[in-house]
């Protein structure tokens, strides 16, 4: 598979086989489906894929396991929410059960949250990174940084260019509605395992 430049994601997992027409753009049909990708911990990320009809055939639609290469994209919903998905550039059938999830991004930090600790004691910070693409469009992706990378993100400036390696994940959380009832929501985000900035070296951050 050919890798992309500043926005590259490879998912290998179990197809949910729930292909549905998503939209028509310039006369080309696009379909959506979900792929289940199991982590080493056993947790399953159910992730949305958008794919052109030109990449689909009967064998792919009926396959149990698929390998998909593409870009993480965002789309603003009419209700104010954001749809985050993998836009497929290439797709292949896996002949046996296999799981893989890797994201490589290069973009610019445009918003940072506050550092905090999880219930398990891990340090975490969330931030938004803008990924440029063709035709002056950008995707604004939510990213989580962990442990030593929390200080790293705190010490670099907004608009800094960063390179990120991690996984595309889904995460359930609960939110109260207007009647006070808890409703399950699903967040889609990038959980980073490695972050590098082109503006700061590690020595500069430690000594600064």
Model-inferred region functions:
Residues 1-208:
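Single-stranded nucleic acid-binding surfaces, predominantly the OB-fold ssDNA-binding core
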């Amino acid at each position: 598979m050919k890798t992309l430049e500043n926005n590259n994601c490879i998912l290998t997992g179990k197809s949910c086989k729930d292909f549905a027409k998503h939209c028509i753009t310039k006369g080309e049909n696009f379909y959506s489906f979900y792929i289940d990708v199991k982590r080493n911990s056993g947790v399953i990320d159910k992730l949305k894929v958008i794919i052109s009809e030109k990449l689909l055939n009967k064998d792919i639609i009926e396959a149990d396991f698929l390998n998909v290469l593409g870009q993480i994209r965002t789309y603003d919903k009419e209700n104010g929410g954001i749809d985050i998905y993998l836009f497929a550039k290439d797709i292949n059938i896996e002949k046996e059960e296999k799981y893989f999830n890797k994201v490589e991004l290069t973009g610019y930090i445009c918003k940072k949250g506050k550092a905090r600790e999880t219930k398990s004691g891990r340090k975490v910070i969330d931030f938004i990174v803008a990924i440029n693409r063709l035709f002056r469009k950008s995707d604004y992706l939510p990213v989580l940084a962990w442990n030593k990378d929390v200080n790293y993100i705190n010490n670099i400036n907004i608009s800094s260019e960063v390179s990120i390696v991690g996984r595309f994940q889904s995460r359930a959380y609960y939110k109260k509605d207007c009647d006070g009832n808890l409703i399950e929501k699903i967040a889609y985000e990038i959980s980073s395992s490695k972050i590098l900035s082109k503006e700061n070296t590690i020595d500069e951050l430690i000594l600064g």
